[in-house]
A protein has these predicted regions:
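Conserved helicase ATPase core of P-loop NTP-dependent helicases/translocases
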Residues: 90-100, 246-247, 257-289
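Conserved RecA-like P-loop NTPase helicase motor core
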Residues: 110-113, 131, 264-268, 275-351
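Conserved Walker A/P-loop ATP-binding site and its immediately adjacent core
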Residues: 57-81
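Conserved pre-motif I regulatory segment
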Residues: 2-38
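Conserved interdomain linker/interface between the two RecA-like ATPase lobes of SF2 helicase motors
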Residues: 166-239
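Walker A/P-loop
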Residues: 31-52, 238
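Post-DEXD/H (motif II) to motif III coupling segment of the RecA-like Helicase ATP-binding lobe
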Residues: 130-186
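C-terminal helicase lobe
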Residues: 313-317, 323-430
């Protein structure tokens, strides 16, 4: 398979793309036949895929490219044609590009599940983290086929049980530093209370989460904050479900903002019209649930996230829609009304070195977060360090106490000292401040105090620091 991955010299590739090609070839040379290539949203997955295809075609091989949705088929074909690949057939009923003799076949996983697999030597799986039974069955049954998976977020449960190797040529942070992805700034205008929301199939229950996010305070804040801080930027808004996203769209429209709503049932013609108007600036805001989380390269410079999630994959996919560098936009602003960045971390801090190997009936083990962001006390930007890179404000930690994973922990040396009343007051005051910042009641701070000291803070003053 190594000789199928020859790098064509037709175009100059970016350094991380050249590195990715080499890493995949090296992995193939080591005997791996099912390789996942991690590449951030906006980092050129299509160009990389075209190089894999060209290398295979040069050796007389046949290729199948699978997309996670029918709506992405034409987009994929156009992208490959722009890279000079023309011998393409589409595996889809009544499609004008249907050509079973073409050496490159493009199909959605939905169509592939209803068809016989054509003869191929290489299968490229786009958005490989979206697991499809037809692809997985093929991987288990056909040892003669070489598989390459493409994903910005290859962290789905059990991927390591199917794929042999994960390669990552460049992180999101490195791509931002090199100018290939946009710089971004995250704000948390609201911190919803999700304590009572149950978990269903690994994520927040949609109906209960909608109830929290549809409250007057948060719904009013979404539009008000955008009008005040959104700078009229082209914006994608993510809601909890269709009803919630449509309601947000109506609120924007009532405020006089040109807004569209799009979901999985939006027909192709209307979707194309919305995209055209969005690109021209006729539409400023597009609201959806998950329809716009993959395969979208619209010129976005603002993300409004109003959909709480426990999924790192979904979190990064949403923010990733705005990381692509576009002419006329210098950076990305993220307004996280769902608190996802506070719970899961900034997208530059989310990274996994290996594929997950959790068996089907076991729960995927959550990794401990190294450092979760907190709001800068001056400009409100979510940051992980003590000094804000945007305004220069320095957060002063309380001596002997630091924050970790949303809790206050005491740093001790040697024997534990008996805390003084002032130290207890300092801790309680900080807990009250943290509760205020997160929109919690004072009882949360009292419980945190009791957890640490074993008693309630009855003799202390309710003052914040």
């Amino acid at each position: 398979m190594k000789d199928m991955l020859v790098t064509p010299q037709r175009k100059t590739l970016r350094p991380h793309q050249v590195k990715a090609l080499k890493m995949v070839r090296d992995s193939a040379a080591a005997g791996n036949r099912k390789i996942v290539c991690q590449l951030a949203t906006g980092a050129g997955k299509t160009v990389l895929a075209s190089r894999f295809i060209e290398g295979a075609l040069e050796k007389g091989k046949r290729v199948m490219f699978t997309a996670p949705a029918v709506s992405l088929i034409d987009q994929s074909v156009s992208a490959f044609e722009n890279e000079g690949i023309t011998d393409i057939g589409v595996l889809q009923a009544s499609h004008p590009r249907t050509n079973p003799d073409a050496r490159v076949q493009v199909a959605s996983v939905q169509t592939l599940a209803r068809r016989d697999m054509p003869p191929v030597d290489l299968v490229i799986v786009d958005e490989a983290h979206i697991r499809a039974k037809v692809v997985e069955d093929l991987m288990q049954q056909r040892d003669d086929i070489f598989f390459i998976g493409l994903s910005a977020t290859p962290w789905a449960k059990g991927m390591g049980l199917l794929w042999d190797d994960l390669i990552c040529a460049c992180t999101v942070s490195e791509l931002i530093q090199q100018g290939f992805l946009s710089k971004f700034q995250v704000f948390a205008p609201d911190i919803p209370d999700l304590d009572g929301v149950k978990t269903v199939a690994g994520d927040y229950d949609s109906k209960q989460a909608e109830g929290v996010m549809s409250g007057k305070s948060i719904m009013g804040s979404i539009v008000e904050n955008w009008l005040r801080n959104g700078e009229n930027r082209p914006t994608l808004v993510f809601g909890v479900n269709r009803a919630h996203a449509a309601s947000i769209a109506e609120d924007f429209q009532r405020a006089g903002v040109a807004t569209a709503y799009i979901d999985a049932f939006t027909d192709v013609v209307e979707r194309q019209q919305i995209e055209r108007k969005f690109r021209s600036g006729e539409i400023k805001v597009a609201c959806s649930v998950r329809t716009l989380t993959t395969g979208v390269d619209w010129p976005v410079s603002c993300i409004v996230d109003a959909a709480p999630t426990q999924s790192e994959i979904l979190h990064l996919q949403k923010i990733g829609r705005g990381l692509r560098v576009n002419p006329g936009t210098e950076d990305l602003k993220v307004f996280d009304h769902a608190g996802n960045s506070l719970r899961l971390g900034l997208v530059t801090d989310i990274h996994h070195e290996e594929l997950d190997k959790t068996p089907p009936k076991q729960r995927q083990k959550a990794e401990k977060k190294e450092k979760l962001p907190k709001a800068c006390g001056n400009c409100g930007t979510l940051i992980t360090g003590l000094v804000c890179p945007f305004c220069g404000h320095e957060r002063k930690p309380i001596p002997g106490v630091e924050t970790e994973d949303g809790e206050l922990i005491e740093i001790t040396e040697g024997e534990r000292k008996v805390p003084t009343k002032q130290e207890k007051q300092d801790f309680y005051s900080m807990a009250l401040w943290l509760a205020m910042k997160r929109g919690y009641k004072h009882g949360w701070a009292a419980n945190l105090y009791r957890k640490k000291f074993g008693v309630w803070p009855r003799s202390l003053e309710e003052v914040m620091k």
